[in-house]
From Swiss-Prot:
Biased composition, class Basic and acidic residues, residue ranges: 52-62, 203-216, 225-237
Motif (Nucleolar localization signal (NLS2)): 217-225
Pfam families xrefs: CUSTOS
Biased composition (Polar residues): 162-177
Remaining remarks: Named Custos for the Latin term for 'guard' or 'keeper'.
Region feature Disordered, mapped onto this chain: 1-23, 50-69, 97-237
Organism field: Xenopus laevis (African clawed frog)
Sequence ranges of Basic residues compositional bias: 181-190
Taxon lineage: Eukaryota, Metazoa, Chordata, Craniata, Vertebrata
Function text: Essential for Spemann-Mangold organizer formation and subsequent anterior head development in the embryo. Inhibits canonical Wnt signaling pathway by antagonizing nuclear import of beta-catenin (ctnnb1) during embryogenesis.
Name of the protein in its database record: Protein CUSTOS
Family recorded in the similarity comment: Belongs to the CUSTOS family.
Gene: custos
Disruption phenotype: Morpholino knockdown results in embryos with small eyes, head and brain structures.
Length: 237
């Protein structure tokens, strides 16, 4: 049973070697590739370094090429100047100085605008109006119903308005009665003539009851026309 296993192991190793050989053959490298890589490496090496060289006096912090004795002399002078300008202060003096500094803080600094006030800025309250909270759906529905009721117009309302407009437009006889009489003296004769014509029409209607209804209707129309003309004359006066 062990012999076939050894054979399989050998066959696996042989197949892997063959695969490696095939991959190497397939991986073809162009002839000029190695030369390009070598040229790039040589160029990188040939470029000058940008690091600061400590040997050069231009970059070692001693451009003036001073001696250490001169440096110590300058350091002593600077120390003396600083000692003369600095003094020791106790705690009590520090408190007094801080209070005085707070009083004079308004004069210090600068103002961004002419209208800006000195001192610390107070709390700025926002002037933006807040939005109203959304009401519930029930309240919205009730408000909409009220608006619809106010805007709605029923047929009864329309009929009422139409009747109110028709009432003042009464018959011409009523209009003539409401108007005040003017210049009665001059028109007495005309009134008498009109009344006589109306009376004659009425008499003919009573005297001849046996005639046709058409004649009676015509006479009624004539009577109405005479009344209308009489009212128009009074209105023009």
């Amino acid at each position: 049973m062990a012999a076939p296993r050894r054979g399989t192991q050998k066959s696996d190793s042989d197949s892997s070697d063959e695969d490696l050989d095939r991959f190497r053959e397939a991986a073809w490298v162009p002839p000029g590739a190695h030369q390009k890589v070598s040229d790039e490496q040589n160029e990188k090496i040939a470029l000058p370094s940008l690091r600061v060289r400590p040997d050069c006096h231009e970059h070692d912090g001693n451009e003036l090429q001073t001696t250490p004795e001169f440096r110590s002399h300058v350091a002593k002078k600077l120390a003396a100047i600083l000692d003369s300008s600095i003094r020791e202060v106790s705690q009590n003096e520090a408190v007094h100085i801080s209070k005085a500094g707070n009083g004079d803080s308004e004069d210090e600094g600068f103002r961004l605008f002419r209208t800006s006030l000195p001192g610390e800025a107070g709390i700025v309250t926002s002037t933006i109006p807040r939005r109203k909270l959304a009401s519930s759906s029930s309240e919205d529905s009730e408000e909409e119903q009220q608006r619809c009721r106010e805007a709605a117009v029923s047929a009864c309302d329309i009929l009422r308005h139409s009747t109110l407009q028709q009432e003042p437009q009464s018959t011409p006889s009523n209009v003539c009665d409401n108007q005040p009489p003017k210049k009665k003296r001059k028109k007495k004769k005309k009134d008498r003539g009109d009344t006589s014509q109306i009376n004659s029409v009425e008499e003919t209607m009573h005297i001849e009851p046996g005639k046709n209804e058409l004649q009676a209707k015509r006479k009624k129309k004539k009577k109405q026309k005479l009344e209308m003309a009489h009212c128009d004359e009074l209105g023009n006066e």
